[in-house]
Amino acid sequence: MSIDVEPTGRPRVLVVGGKPKLVRKARELGLDVVHAQYPDAYDRVHWPHVDQALLLDYGDMDRFLPLARALHEVYPFQSAVALFELGLLPAARINEELGLNGESVETVELLLDKWRMRQRLAEKGISPMASAIGRSAQDVRDFVKAHGLPIIVKPVRESGSVGVFRVDDEAGVEAVAGRYRSLDDEQWAVGDLFSADSFDEFLMEEYLDGPEISVETLSFDGRHVVCAITDKAAFGGGSGFVELGLSQPSRHPEETLDEVRRLVADFLDAVGLRNGPGHTEIRLTSRGPRIIESHNRIGGYGVNEMVETAYGVDMERYTLGVRFGLVEPLASAPEPLGGVALQALTPEPGRVVEVNGVDAVRADPAFVDLHVKVKPGDVVNPLTWNEDIGGYVIARGADATEAIAHSKRLAAAIHVRTEPVA
């Protein structure tokens, strides 16, 4: 590989996947940027912030790794970074293969593979939960016979609430394996799924009662700092697991949150996460907090913008900057500056005719951010996973309660009119 480049003396990062704002923030920190991205996800908005681009399916490591190695030889980068689910393992593989700084492949694999994560927690005696791998309706029957109803059936790998089902009765027991297999027939886009065989087997777990929260962390050489605890206020969709409302700071009792903080620190130690972001989902059950799953990335939707609004911490900037010595690690958990809430936009399924109210929402004093995913001509699908929402609005308030009210008000002001698809 021959590339004519002028040395800049700046540290250089390989950013694997993710949104344009990540390469922009890398550039703002003073980094040279190499960007690996799907060809159809790379356009002129990236150009001012990217020095070299590798446009390919970066999940195909047989192609990606040789190209990254060859580029590294003539245009060396100090670390590969990913904050998008499907980029986490490729980034870790490249760092390991090239001897660069980053989280271990073992840690990333533990967090991506929910069954391996459960086994590790069982070994450590952390967050006990009945679970097993299934491949057939008989496996579901056997698990229910051993542990009772309700249960949760979900992919071993995947995120965004795709393929998550709650089974409440015998009819559900008989149907869930078939529903799961039918996911193979869906038309998934590149970047939707971790792998083509994601639905060959599933994870069965006992159902956890109680409200759900997520814990947003940054780790610095094994020291875990809780940046925020996010309340998940509303769920919806056919599965009942599509996240529709989020808020910070958490409104749960401080005694409960202290227990959560201790659990998350023990969990991150158990999986070996030493540096960078974490997004750990937890149920506050009648038996105490229990781990649902975790990721070595920042939470999806607008969680980074929420943490920055409520606590003044840009987790993306810390993820990039601390690794290269451009940002000082957080000394302690930040104190809240106010409240913030996110409300999903859930237009009626059908073809989008018009979208109104955007300008008025952006001008509102409570406005923080708005992401409308649909435009006239697009088709809105029924809610089955997080990617089916029509977008979201984020609002601020004096506290979480006020922010929730503002977010609902602003979401209601966005009018997405649809018509039936012929």
Regions found by a protein language model. Give the residues of each.
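ATP-dependent carboxylate/phosphate-activation module, predominantly the ATP-grasp catalytic core
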Residues: 171, 199, 206-273, 277, ...
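A structural supersecondary motif
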Residues: 278, 361-379
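ATP-binding N-terminal substructure of ATP-dependent carboxylate-amine bond-forming enzymes
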Residues: 1-107, 112, 138, 325, ...
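A conserved helix-loop-beta module that forms one wall/lid of the active-site cleft
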Residues: 97-163, 178, 182-191
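A common structural junction motif
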Residues: 182-185, 362-366, 410-420
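A glycine-rich beta-turn/hairpin centered on an aromatic-Pro dipeptide
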Residues: 327-366
